[in-house]
A protein has these predicted regions:
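Noncatalytic linker/hinge segments flanking ATPase motor cores
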Residues: 38, 54-59, 85-91, 179-184, ...
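Flexible, gly/proline-biased loop segments at the beginnings
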Residues: 1-65, 190, 227, 231-235, ...
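Short, surface-exposed secondary-structure junctions/capping segments
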Residues: 73-80, 102-111, 280-290
Length: 294
C-alpha cells in the first residue's frame, strides 16, 4: 500500500474516533468500524441480543469477510461454515455506488492508480539499488581464447554480485585476448529514464486529492516557495467538511434503529443527542435559563 494512502486512511479514522464519547461500541470498536468503512466503503454493525431478544450490545463485523446474501441476510466468511446473521440483526452502512446497491464504494477509488504507481516506483527503486545500482545489462564475449571454465566463473561472479555485498570488482585475465573480448552492455539508465522524484510527488498529491485530505496535515513539504495553510486551520476545515458528516452518519444509523436502546446510541463531542452539531449562541444573544431570577 502506498505510504500516503495508508497514512491518510489512519488519519481519517483517528479524526472520527477523536471525538467519540461512548455508546454501544468501545473506543477500539469505533476505530475498527470507521477504518473498515473508509477502507472498504461499508461496515456492518451487529446487534447483540440477550435471551429475551433485547439488544444489549453492538459489535462491528470484519468488513473484509462480510457478504450479503440474496435473501438480504449477512454472512461472515471464516474457516469452516460461514456465520449467518439475519438482516434485522445488522445495521449496515455503505458509501453510495451508482452501479450497484449491495456493497459500498470507497470514496478514494479514483486515486487507486496513483497509489499503485507510487508503490511501484518505490519498489522499482528498491530493486534498482538491491541489484547494484543498475538496471541490468548484457555480458558480451567475443574472445575465442575464453575457456568454458572462465565463462562459468564469470557467470558465477555476476550472480554473486547481486544483493548484499554487491559492490565487488572482477579480474579477468585472458591470454592473448582482444581489447573488446568481454564487454558489458547496460540495458537502461535509471537515472535518465526513471522520473522517480516526479512520480512520487505527483502520485502522492493525486492520492491526497482522492481523499480530499489537506497537504498540511499529511506531512507534505512545500516546494518552490509554496506556502500552506496552518495545520490548525486545515484541520478545522477538514473536520467540518469531512469528519463531522461521518460522525453524524454513524450516530444517525444507530439512533434511528428502533431496537437499539438510548444508552447504546453513539455519542460524539460537538454533536447533540440527535446527532446534530451543537450550535453556540451569537455574541449578542442573551440566554436565559431557569433560576436566573428574571
Amino acid at each position: 500500500m502506498c505510504g500516503q494512502h495508508g497514512g491518510v486512511l489512519y488519519a481519517r479514522k483517528n479524526m472520527v474516533v477523536s471525538d467519540y464519547a461512548g455508546g454501544g461500541l468501545s473506543l477500539g470498536e469505533m476505530g475498527q468500524a470507521a477504518y473498515d468503512y473508509l477502507l472498504f466503503g461499508d461496515i456492518a454493525i451487529l446487534k447483540v441480543r440477550n435471551g429475551w431478544g433485547d439488544v444489549v450490545d453492538l459489535v462491528p463485523l470484519p468488513a473484509l469477510y462480510v457478504r450479503r446474501r440474496k435473501d438480504g441476510d449477512f454472512s461472515v466468511l471464516q474457516k469452516g461454515p460461514p456465520l449467518i446473521y439475519s438482516a434485522r440483526d445488522v445495521i449496515f452502512l455503505r458509501q453510495y455506488d451508482p452501479q450497484q446497491q449491495v456493497y459500498g464504494l470507497p470514496d478514494y477509488i479514483g486515486g487507486m492508480h496513483s497509489a499503485l504507481l507510487n508503490t511501484e516506483a518505490t519498489i522499482f527503486r528498491r530493486r534498482y539499488y538491491h541489484n547494484g545500482a543498475h538496471t541490468g545489462g548484457i555480458i558480451y564475449t567475443t574472445d575465442p581464447n575464453l575457456s568454458d571454465e572462465m565463462e562459468e566463473d564469470i557467470a558465477k561472479k555476476i550472480e554473486e554480485s547481486k544483493g548484499v555485498g554487491n559492490f565487488k570488482m572482477m579480474f579477468i585475465n585472458i591470454a592473448d585476448g582482444g581489447e573488446k573480448g568481454v564487454q558489458f552492455i547496460p540495458i537502461g539508465d535509471a537515472g535518465v529514464k526513471d522520473e522517480f522524484a516526479n512520480i512520487k510527488s505527483i502520485s502522492a498529491q493525486d492520492v491526497l486529492t482522492a481523499h480530499r485530505f489537506p497537504s498540511g496535515l499529511a506531512g507534505i513539504i512545500p516546494t518552490n516557495g509554496a506556502v500552506m495553510a496552518s495545520p490548525e486551520t486545515a484541520r478545522d476545515t477538514y473536520r467540518k467538511d469531512e469528519v463531522i458528516p461521518l460522525q453524524r452518519m454513524f450516530a444517525s444509523a444507530v439512533r434511528h434503529d428502533p431496537e437499539v436502546p438510548p444508552h447504546l446510541h453513539l455519542q460524539f463531542e460537538g454533536l447533540n443527542s440527535d446527532g446534530l452539531p451543537l450550535t453556540k449562541p451569537a455574541d449578542n444573544e442573551i440566554v436565559i435559563t431557569p433560576g436566573d431570577g428574571v
